[in-house]
Regions:
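Surface-exposed, glycine/proline- and aromatic-rich loop segments on solvent-exposed faces
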Residues: 34, 58-139, 197-203
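Short, intrinsically disordered, low-complexity terminal segments
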Residues: 8-11, 39, 137
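Secretory targeting signatures
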Residues: 1-24
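Glycine-aromatic-enriched beta-strand/loop faces of beta-sandwich-type recognition domains
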Residues: 128-171
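Short, hydrophobic/aromatic-enriched beta-strand segments in well-ordered soluble domains
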Residues: 90-93, 177-181
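Acidic/polar low-complexity flexible segments
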Residues: 24-53, 106-135, 170-172, 181-233
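Extended low-polarity, hydrophobic cluster-rich segments
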Residues: 73-79, 155-157, 171-175, 179
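Disordered, acidic Ser/Thr/Pro-rich linker "stalks" and the adjacent N-terminal cap
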Residues: 50-54, 58-60, 157
Length: 233
């Protein structure tokens, strides 16, 4: 049974499911023209050593993960997988102001060839507990995404970068996730969408597809997350 929603949960749910009229993604592409960009996840046995505090805590913490830079290098995503978990570290280099609970990152996955269902994981800056939502290609448009209990061993935390950060010494927003892949269905590849928000400024993967802090990109416009050695599923 889903627990009673607190104020933060309600705010997060509204942030995710609200889709303005006139659309939020670029209208100069169609699913027939869109070619899904791909991210490669690295297999890394160092991921269990991650200190989940929202920052790059020590020199080698995220070193054995794939490096992905988007939006002119302002959004940096490190990705790795190990023992049926997906690990994400997201840096928003532009966000140097701390708006606790308002700055956030959402990462969404859907197993390829697994139907239209997808799961979104939310980490908010300054909060140690993330949130999980489930939806499908229809509910993304009609506001029907549902807040569900977090899967066991899920971590979603937002914080401020430390002096160990590899990209910018000025303190900025950083987010860390540990997502149990078994909870959404093990697969070799996933449809993948990520969005990090600083007030009205939005950065995404795939890049430049949304300009609003609200809503989820339609599933057909998502990118793809996979591993070269087929070790993710």
């Amino acid at each position: 049974m889903v627990k009673t929603l607190d104020i933060i949960s309600i705010a997060i749910l509204a942030f995710v499911v609200t889709i303005p009229v006139n659309g939020e993604f670029e209208e100069n592409s169609s699913p027939l023209e869109f070619h899904s960009p791909q991210i490669i996840s690295a297999l890394s046995d160092t991921m269990p050593n991650v200190n989940f505090d929202g920052a790059w805590s020590f020199t080698t913490e995220w070193k054995q993960s794939s490096l992905n830079e988007f939006n002119s290098g302002l959004m940096i995503v490190r990705i790795a997988h190990y023992d049926e978990f997906l690990y994400l570290h997201v840096n928003n280099l532009f966000d140097i102001t701390n708006n606790r609970g308002a700055d956030r990152t959402i990462a969404c996955l859907s197993p390829i060839n697994g139907g239209d269902d997808f799961w979104c994981f939310v980490a908010s800056r300054g909060l140690k507990t993330g949130h999980t939502l489930i939806g499908n290609s229809v509910s993304a448009f009609d506001g029907g995404l549902k807040l569900i209990p977090n899967p066991e061993n899920f971590v979603g935390i937002g914080g401020t970068s430390s002096d160990k950060d590899r990209y910018l010494k000025i303190p900025h927003a950083a987010y860390e996730f540990k997502i149990p892949l078994e909870s959404i269905g093990n697969a070799q590849s996933y449809k993948f969408f990520i969005k990090t928000i600083d007030g009205e400024q939005v950065y995404t993967f795939p890049e430049n597809m949304m300009h609003s802090a609200n809503g989820i990109l339609p599933l057909e416009y998502w990118g793809e997350l996979t591993s070269r050695d087929k070790t993710m599923g």
